[in-house]
Amino acid sequence: MKNEFLGHSESHETILTLFQKHNDDVKQLVGISKTIATYRKYEVTRRHLAEFIRSKYNVSDISIKEISPMFITDFELYLRTACKCGYNTTAKFMQFFKRIIIIARNNGILVGDPFASYKIRLEKVDRGYLTEDEIKIILKKKMVSERLEHVRDLFIFACFTGLAYIDVAGLTQDNICKSFDGNLWIMTKRQKTNTDVNVPLLDIPKMILKKYKGKLPDGKILPVISNQKLNAYLKEIADICGIKKNLTFHLARHTFATTTTLSKGVPIETVSKMLGHTNIETTQIYARITNSKIGSDMQGLDKKFVGIEKIYKEVAM
């Protein structure tokens, strides 16, 4: 039994071996149906699992048949303590690990389900975003250098298109298309999920594209720099503009979801599609309805009760 647990029995496939086979398959699908980001997450999960097995059992691998509910909870504890992973990061790693267990069960390697009583829940994160007034401050502020002007333009472009950094960086003129309605759209694929992203261009992103048209090398349509430098320069812009929020490029995506679209009455189904989300629950995490939107909605509702208010006034006043 000890040899089986330690993965020494030839009749029992080991967990890290199966995990590696799975990751090799994912690697071959990168650029087809998987992204490099997904592959890397599986690789990191496997590495943490290998370190846990080595630390807990002093072996290099164990039999899949010995994976128990206790093993699952011990691995979670290891991620939270030894690896110092946050709640949601730990939950993501456990989701990737569960995928391997599902494969083992589907292939008859494992009969029971060690995850049966284990619930993976993600904490809701209050995503930051810029208000319309803060966007206006950034737009109006004179930038002290061309470098910061470029960064400001990229950030504002994302605030009005919702594109993530990697997708902005990959844009070419081929992605700017005249659609069925005669308007210009961005038509691309979201690299993270390989889903279609089609976004009608508002006037501000159109003006930004026009500003750089024919002025950049290598067929670029925007002055893209590395994400690391971009975020460093955004902190400079935040200081210049007196904005206290943590200004990152991804904040522009949250701003698009909240301030640019949902708060202006764009249906969440439409926003979800433009963001390239595969399910609407993801959009609900990103998007927060602002107080101004709540106020304007309730004002509109108030007008619909004018008749009832008159009745009450006649009776009670």
Where are these regions (language model features)?
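C-terminal catalytic core of Y-nucleophile DNA break-rejoin enzymes
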Residues: 191-210, 215-236
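Catalytic-site neighborhood detector that most strongly recognizes the C-terminal catalytic loop/helix
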Residues: 129, 190-194, 227, 275-300
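C-terminal catalytic core of tyrosine-transesterase DNA break-rejoin enzymes
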Residues: 156, 160, 166-167, 255-278, ...
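N-terminal DNA-binding recognition helix of tyrosine site-specific recombinases/integrases
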Residues: 37, 45-55, 81-115, 166
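C-terminal secondary-structure termini that scaffold catalytic or DNA-interacting sites
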Residues: 301-317
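Short, basic (Lys/Arg/His-rich) helix/loop patches that form interaction surfaces
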Residues: 145, 215-220, 224, 232-273
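Conserved tyrosine-mediated DNA breakage-rejoining catalytic core shared by Y-recombinases
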Residues: 125-128, 134, 170-208
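Basic, Lys/Arg- and aromatic-enriched nucleic-acid-binding interface segment
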Residues: 87, 91-93, 110, 115-165
